[in-house]
A protein has these predicted regions:
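Transmembrane-helix signature of polytopic, membrane-embedded enzymes
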Residues: 38-46, 196-198, 214-237, 270, ...
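Membrane-interface transmembrane helices that cradle and orient dolichyl/undecaprenyl
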Residues: 220, 261-277, 311
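Membrane-lumen/periplasm interface segments of specific transmembrane helices
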Residues: 307, 311, 330-379, 414-480, ...
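Hydrophobic, aromatic-rich transmembrane alpha-helices
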Residues: 19-21, 187, 214-215, 312, ...
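Transmembrane-helix motifs of polytopic, lipid-linked glycan transferases
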Residues: 22, 81-90, 198-222, 260
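Short periplasmic/luminal acceptor-recognition loop of GT-C membrane glycosyltransferases, typified by
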Residues: 691-696, 700-736, 755-764
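Membrane-embedded, hydrophobic transmembrane alpha-helices
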Residues: 1-107, 463-467, 471-474, 554, ...
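Aromatic/acidic, Gly/Pro-rich catalytic loop(s) in extracytoplasmic/lumenal soluble domains
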Residues: 755-802
């Protein structure tokens, strides 16, 4: 890549990032005037929340107008930036210079233990940035339906889920009606680079928001600054939390915006700030548009604030109806209400207009039409051995398309073996209703407290996925009754009641969230190791548990030395565990291991030695990747220890910073910019190398052997994103595969001018599909292999012979 091109793309990216900042600053300054308890973390929360809201609104407006392209986005960002600067100038004409902006300062200087906590968390954040910038994702769901959505938006400049032939772009029925608010941020990050570099950057923003919100809520519920920082750090360094940043999963953003909205609602309840109420309403709308199950969280927040306001009106006799009402509605509140309706209703209104959902059943949607029409089955060419249909007297009904896998990863299947005995047709049992199956997929429906194996499976997944940070949080929070007994002051107050209710509510919402059992709800009383992968649905509960732990630690005055030690160990152990999880996932992705992480964890129950040996075998070639971060971390801790020992109060450092002249600050800023430019350059180069290794060179093959906008058909693949190419400029068409309609399927390929098809790795399917694929890819079949070797374990490409 030419340095000029790289610098130009980086400048465009920075324009997109900086655009909404003045508008967010104007909101933060307005809030500063209304809230007497304003603090620097509160300022950062308002700034980042306002930035996220503005960016998503820009993306939704442009995407709905079919203008989600780089030029339109840059113009919109510049316009938003100008509006923000005008608002700041109009409200602060006398102090418009940057040096006079009212950015709040820390009320008390940071002590060494707090600096250590901040430093450990910042180190984890740096590692996350390095990971998302240098390593492409191998996450199952991200490659299956999250990233293909973003790629298609990038190609069409609009929010479409259809390919060029009018078919769905992925084989996930439910994903067609998901809301995608947070994905809009990722789509904006794709535009300047024309590839998925920094596509996961919004996940890092969500990670930061999560930490700030947990800290502020801890303070709100009575914790001191030190314990609030510790709680936030422990939540952020949970291995499962770290492992979600380099994905496009909406669960971390959901937890982050939920805790943000909870804090803003409680802050408004005490400060009566209209800007905070505006942000609260807009955040609630954003939550509703992040995920379908988030509708319950959004409704809970609105209902909770309504209850608090009604209680305030009833209990306080001096609180007259005039004071209860907002006398003068400011424009900022009107904007918040409009954002709530727009962000919360956009995707659901779109679904109602485009595909008649949820009014109609998504399985009965006939628009767009599938390419294979429903005439009577046409028998396909017979493979050499055995025939594609069993030699039974009764006719066999047409074989349906294979169902999409259960959400979450599944282990690749081994190569198909020829059946020993053909199955006898049976009358299928009536399937359960969709709503019943959804309920049966929840942990509440499947978990049997009297079943020891259920406790073992769930406990082992929690222990290995969440590790020391969760154990420390849970242990401290569980000592709350002790604080109630020993407390000399009144413990049962409104704040503690609110915290208890919200904690219990988020716990209940987790266990009744679909797929928390790891199963699809086909039967009752079953748990799957996939429940460990789906622990991410419980992030809101984990956040509230950390807040409760901070409040409890404050009441019990838990020793700070112990807390600091736990935080420092949790930070590096979380980083190492996250790296291990990635290496195991990558080994399964590339076919070097056939065991997925959740199944490997479950194997520790009965085959401990075998599981340990398998982990060592996977990690053996990657020991340097595991050792580099601990070495840097220990080195930084030693440096900090020497610095604190020589100057505990850091007066010398403060005096040095105070003595710097304006020119020195400018020089430091220039050096930081130069480091950022060079670091991102190196990161992109490293990402290209890692992508070629993990994706096995499929991007390189597509770039060299196909032309932009060439059509590539795919079927039976949960990695369809790989077929778009590095620059996302290949037309990827979904071609539903029917083993009993091979001639019609081939005609459909020719009709759509598809000369190359991709599929694999394969999941569970019927024997006839396996036999049909074996014939298609045989020397006598119509497909010629051009990339990949084993479609059972990797994505492969074939060209049509005729």
């Amino acid at each position: 890549m030419l340095i000029a091109q790289y610098l130009w793309e980086l400048i465009l990216f920075l324009i997109i990032i900086v655009g909404p900042i003045p508008l967010s600053l104007s909101l933060a300054f307005e809030n500063h005037k209304e809230n007497s308890n304003y603090s620097f973390p509160h300022f950062l929360l308002v700034l980042l929340t306002g930035w996220s809201l503005a960016q998503i609104c820009i993306g939704l407006i442009l995407g709905s107008a079919d203008r989600l392209n780089l030029a339109a986005v840059i113009i919109a960002e510049m316009l938003i930036c100008a509006i923000g600067l005008i608002l700041i100038y109009a409200k602060n004409q006398k102090s418009f210079s940057f040096s006079q902006w009212q950015i709040p300062q820390l009320k008390q200087p940071l002590i060494p233990s707090e600096l250590l906590i901040i430093g450990a968390t910042a180190f984890a954040g740096f590692v996350l940035w390095e990971t998302l910038a240098t390593k492409p994702t191998t996450n199952y769901d991200s490659l299956w339906f999250h990233l293909p959505v973003i790629a298609r938006w990038y190609q069409t400049h609009s929010f479409t889920f259809l390919d060029a032939a009018g078919n769905w772009i992925f084989e996930h029925e439910q994903a067609r009606v998901y809301p995608y608010n947070w994905h809009v941020l990722s789509a904006l990050c794709v535009l300047p680079f024309k590839e998925d570099f920094l596509t996961a950057f919004p996940m890092l923003i969500a990670w930061v928001l999560e930490g700030i919100a947990v800290y502020l809520l801890s303070i709100k519920f009575g914790a001191t600054r030190f314990y609030g920082m510790a709680a936030a750090s422990l939540v952020l360094t949970v291995p499962m939390m770290l492992n979600q940043v380099n994905t496009i999963h909406p669960d971390l953003p959901l937890a982050a915006i939920f805790t943000v909205a909870l804090y803003l609602g409680l802050s408004y309840h005490s400060s009566r700030s209209q800007s905070e109420l505006s942000l609260f309403l807009a955040s609630v709308g954003m939550i509703a548009g992040i995920k379908i199950t988030a509708l319950v969280y959004a409704a809970s927040l609105l209902g909770g604030l309504a209850i608090l306001e009604i209680k305030r009106f009833i209990v306080n006799k001096n609180f007259t109806p005039t004071n209860f009402r907002i006398r003068h509605i400011k424009p900022v509140l009107v904007c918040g209400i409009l954002c709530c309706l727009f962000l919360g209703g956009f995707w659901y209104a779109r679904n109602l207009l485009h595909i008649n959902y949820p009014v109609g059943d998504s399985r009965e949607i006939n628009i767009p039409l599938q390419p294979v029409a429903p005439p009577s089955p046409v028998p396909g060419p017979k493979p050499p051995v055995p025939g594609p249909k069993p030699p039974v007297a009764s006719p066999k009904p047409p074989v349906a398309s294979p169902k999409p896998p259960v959400p979450g990863p599944k282990p690749p299947v081994a190569s198909p073996k020829p059946p020993v005995q053909q199955p006898t047709p049976t009358i299928p049992a009536p399937s359960a209703s969709p709503l019943l199956k959804i309920w049966q997929s929840t942990l509440a429906a499947q978990f049997n407290p009297s079943n020891i194996s259920h406790w073992q499976m769930f406990g082992l997944q929690v222990l290995i996925r969440l590790q020391l940070p969760f154990l420390a949080i849970a242990l401290q929070a569980s000592s709350a009754p002790l604080a109630l007994i020993q407390g000399k002051t009144r413990i049962i107050n409104q704040n503690n009641i609110i915290l208890t209710v919200v904690l219990a509510s988020t716990g209940i919402l987790y266990v009744i969230t679909p797929y928390t059992s790891g199963t699809a709800g086909e039967a009752i009383g079953q748990l799957s190791p996939l429940l460990g992968f789906n622990l991410r649905y419980g992030f809101p509960f984990l956040s509230l548990l950390a807040i409760a732990a901070a409040a409890t630690a404050t009441e019990l005055k838990t020793r700070k030395q112990v807390i600091v030690a736990v935080v420092l160990i949790s930070s590096i152990s979380g980083i190492i565990s996250n790296t291990i999880f990635d290496l195991i996932k990558n080994a399964s992705f590339t076919g070097k291991s056939i065991v997925w992480g959740s199944w490997l964890i479950d194997r520790f129950k009965s085959h401990f030695a075998e599981a340990i040996n398998l982990v060592i075998k996977i990690l053996a070639p990657r020991w340097p990747d595991l050792g580099i971060y601990p070495l840097i971390y220990v080195g930084l801790l030693l440096l900090a220890g020497i610095l604190f020992k020589r100057n505990p109060s850091l007066i010398g450092l403060k005096n040095l910073l105070a003595s710097l002249k304006k020119s020195s600050y400018i020089m430091i800023i220039c050096v930081c910019i130069a480091l950022m430019v060079s670091a991102t350059w190196v990161a992109r180069e490293k990402r290209d190398v890692a992508r070629a290794e993990l994706y096995r060179g499929i991007y390189e093959y597509i770039d060299k052997n196909t032309v932009p906008n060439e059509k590539i058909g795919f079927f039976l693949s949960y990695r369809s994103y790989l077929f778009y190419g590095k620059n996302l400029d290949r037309q990827v068409l979904y071609v539903p595969f029917r083993a009993d309609r091979l001639p019609a399927w081939m005609d459909n390929l020719h009709k759509n001018n598809i000369k190359m098809v991709g599929f694999g790795p394969l999941t569970e399917m019927d024997e006839y599909t396996k036999l049909a694929l074996s014939w298609l890819t045989s020397p006598e079949g119509p497909l010629q292999p051009v990339f990949g070797k084993d479609f059972n374990t990797e994505s492969v490409l074939y060209r049509l012979k005729y």
